[in-house]
């Protein structure tokens, strides 16, 4: 009931990704515990609405921090990959918060800042030099509550000393994970997964959309962490491969 059978000659799997759940593996971030601990996605919604506030009281924050690599580059939870876009998005959102709230101090706690392409110049340095966003290399180990603020605790790895920073708003830069749709398509079409749980591409670096199943191609974050440009490029390549496969099949039939 509600199902429809469709006969097709080729398939492009473009099932995207899902965001890491920062409360799924550990409560060190206090995501389900403290209202003022949110994610990049939550922040993007507020920025689009033109109203960045603390969820706990509806007031504009005076101190905000981003915590990078939440659910990425983490062997303890098994996510041993860089999600590729989090650093750039955090810098973009940091700039937008400073534009919206000029008196708000913004911090970014990071392991390494990984900026791809022109983001290094257009976003990263712009955030530091023009908008005075504070970048602190360190490891966050715990988020607690003190009064009406959340307190970020960890280590400043550059200075080699303990870190404790009271914040009004903590933003978690959550990484990418294989989506449920990717897992379902893998089972449905018997597509092998690579070691991280994404659909395996067998075409090498010059042909990243080919899978182990003839006529089935993969695009975007279904094959691994990807930004918008990667996804669009792979989508176009997969569509061309699918069209070529269909044409080849029709020529054989003729």
Model-derived segments and their meaning:
Residues 1-254:
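Residues forming the flavin
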């Amino acid at each position: 009931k509600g199902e429809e059978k469709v006969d097709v000659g080729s398939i492009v799997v473009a099932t995207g990704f899902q965001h890491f759940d920062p409360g799924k593996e550990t409560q060190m971030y206090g995501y389900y515990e403290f209202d003022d601990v949110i994610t990049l996605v939550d922040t993007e919604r507020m920025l689009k609405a033109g109203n960045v506030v603390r969820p706990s009281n509806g007031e504009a924050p005076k101190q905000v921090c981003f915590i990078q690599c939440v659910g990425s580059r983490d062997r303890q939870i098994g996510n041993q990959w860089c999600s590729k876009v989090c650093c750039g998005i955090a810098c973009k959102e940091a700039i937008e918060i400073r534009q919206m709230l000029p008196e708000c101090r913004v911090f970014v706690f990071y392991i390494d800042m990984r900026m791809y392409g022109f983001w290094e110049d257009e976003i990263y340095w712009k955030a530091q030099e023009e908008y005075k966003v504070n970048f602190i290399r360190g490891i966050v180990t715990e988020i607690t509550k003190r009064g009406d603020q959340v307190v970020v605790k960890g280590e400043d790895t550059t200075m080699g000393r303990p870190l404790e920073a009271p914040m009004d708003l903590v933003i978690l830069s959550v990484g990418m994970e294989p989506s449920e749709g990717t897992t379902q398509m893998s089972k449905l079409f018997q597509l092998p997964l690579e070691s991280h749980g994404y659909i395996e591409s067998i075409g090498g670096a010059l042909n990243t959309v080919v899978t182990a199943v003839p006529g089935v191609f993969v695009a975007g974050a279904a094959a691994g962490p990807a930004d918008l440009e990667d996804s669009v490029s792979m989508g176009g390549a997969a569509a061309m491969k699918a069209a070529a496969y269909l044409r080849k099949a029709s020529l054989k039939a003729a």
